[in-house]
Amino acid sequence: MESSSVASASSEAGSSRSLEIEELERFIDSYVLEYQVQGLLTDKTEGDGESDKTQSNVSQWTVECTERLEENRTSPRNREPTYSQNGNKEGPLDMLGTDIWAASTVESISGATWDLQPEKLDFTQLQLRQRNSPKHPPPQIDRDGFGKGKRVEGDDINLNDIEKVLPTWQGYSPLPHEADIAQTKKLFRRKRNDRRKQQKPQGGNKQPPSQQNDHQPATAKHNSREHQRQYHGNPPPPHPSGKQGHHGYSQNRRWHHNQKHLPNDLQRNAKETDTLKIEDASVCTVHIPLDIHSNTDSTERHCPPANDSEAKRKESIQSRDRPKISLLQSSKDRLRRRLKEKEDVAVESTNPQKTKMDKLIEILNSMRNNSSDVDYKLTTFMAEAQNSANSEEMLGEIVKTIYQKAVTDRSFAHTAAKLCDRMALFMVEGTKFRSLLLNMLQKDFSIREEMHRSDVERWLGFITFLCEVFGTMRSNMAEPFRVLVCPIYTCLRELLQSEDVKEDAVLCCSMELQSAGRLLEDQLPEMMSELLATARDKMLCPSESMLTRSLLLEVIELHANSWNPLTPTITQYYNKTIQKLTG
């Protein structure tokens, strides 16, 4: 009886083992057949002679990706470590010897060996390594809404309370010293009214010029000449009694609730400027343009009514209490284009007497994303470049010109990516345009940390152009360059972790995710999950600015909508919020 059970157990084990062997053989056959169809297996055997040199010069990008793969295999995610077919777990990531980031740099121009066909690379096994914990970690958020143990009342986050997630615009709590300011203004008004009542019986309906300068514009007794004298900073006539103003204040230092002095008034002294600076900002926020000439009369200006000025005063106090956000000029330009504001750009005409390279530069400078004839200019540039590129050096200069223009002017990045996509297969003496461009991107990616410290504008421009190239350019098989996926995720994560230009970096990350987020998630969804987790932690951190939280909330909501465009109402809400925060 025991022998029969042992025999049946051994037969079952043998049958299961034979099934596993057959399944492994089918997997190996399909693996070999796949690479035979793609033509990569033969290319690998032909390039075995050069594989030693390639592996000895592994680039920084390959090392980083290998480290990420190893750390993710050991990360606590309840995943079993995946082994390759030969059992070797620590082999190099570039199994086919076609690592585009391990190619030579731009300075050593060579032949067609630079075009290593990055569209055939497979990064499906690539994982992201764990993020380094920051010095001051954000508050731990239970994203599921429930703890693993006993739930404590008040620990969860109620997203229905939108005031905790995104600031509203219903006003701010009064400052501690606001009551003192209001009381001081009240005293000044009372003293001023008492002084006017005392002076009315003496002068009747005729008032001295000094009182006319202090009177409100609503009395309709001002003329344009008196307004001109007051706004140009001419000192008022002395008091009839020969005394100074009330409590030692001059006539110009009184609280004027319906008038605004010019910012370029040079006649006032430093004390008067300091005294009126806060009052002018809080009383009247209407700016009236003036043309000041020596022989011309200024037109009569009227301030808004008292109720309008009071509303303006409250709004100005709220804007003064709000932390000021300063953005780079390039970030302001990108926001302006997002909010669909018109941009007037002067375009110079082409001079036929200039050199060929100067003509190409002029065509590049005349291109804009919002111009109607951008396609025509792209075609003109391509024709001019083909006529000019008669050597490898000239082709390298053309690529360098386009690249420098794209990384220094972020508004040109999308147009430059379209131009590079059209000229990708352009070849001179065995050197492709695409290979030179990818090598330039690789070089700047390797020095991105130094670039971040020395030139923030160029750092942001490089990341923008890198994302635009990934979202626009396609390979011969109409697929995106998967070799750029991991560098882009690295750059986007560094944008969220930046501390010196927080708002500019978050704005850049938000806009690139809105344009290329779907494509990035299709290539490596796990890295997108890690990036969005960082974005959520940063959005819920109370130390972040309102602009940062608004931009990140928009990205998270866009991802929840499967990267489809949001409804016009929601889009208009975010646009108005950004206008208020950056205006």
From Swiss-Prot:
Q: Which residue ranges have biased composition labelled Low complexity?
A: 200-213
Q: Where are the transmembrane segments?
A: none
Subcellular localization, as worded in the UniProt entry: Cytoplasm, Perinuclear region
Q: Which UniProt keywords apply?
A: Cytoplasm, Nonsense-mediated mRNA decay, Translation regulation
Compositional bias (Basic residues) at which positions? 190-199
Could you state one GO biological process linked to this protein?
Answer: nuclear-transcribed mRNA catabolic process, nonsense-mediated decay
Which InterPro entries does the record match to this protein?
Answer: ARM-type_fold (IPR016024), MIF4G-like_typ-3 (IPR003890), mRNA_TranslReg/HistoneTransl (IPR051367)
Per the record, the similarity remark reads: Belongs to the CTIF family.
Composition-biased stretches (Polar residues): 54-63
Function of the molecule: Specifically required for the pioneer round of mRNA translation mediated by the cap-binding complex (CBC), that takes place during or right after mRNA export via the nuclear pore complex (NPC). In contrast, it is not involved in steady state translation, that takes place when the CBC complex is replaced by cytoplasmic cap-binding protein eIF4E. Also required for nonsense-mediated mRNA decay (NMD), the pioneer round of mRNA translation mediated by the cap-binding complex playing a central role in nonsense-mediated mRNA decay (NMD).
Gene Ontology cellular-component terms listed: perinuclear region of cytoplasm
Q: What is this protein called?
A: CBP80/20-dependent translation initiation factor
Per its UniProt record, what SUPFAM superfamilies does this chain match? ARM repeat
List residues of the MIF4G domain. 361-562
Residue span of region Disordered: 42-95, 129-154, 190-251, 294-325
Q: Bias regions of kind Basic and acidic residues — which residues?
A: 43-53, 65-80, 141-154, 298-324
GO MF annotations, alphabetized = RNA binding
Checking Gene3D superfamilies in the record gives: 1.25.40.180
Keyword Cytoplasm (UniProt): yes
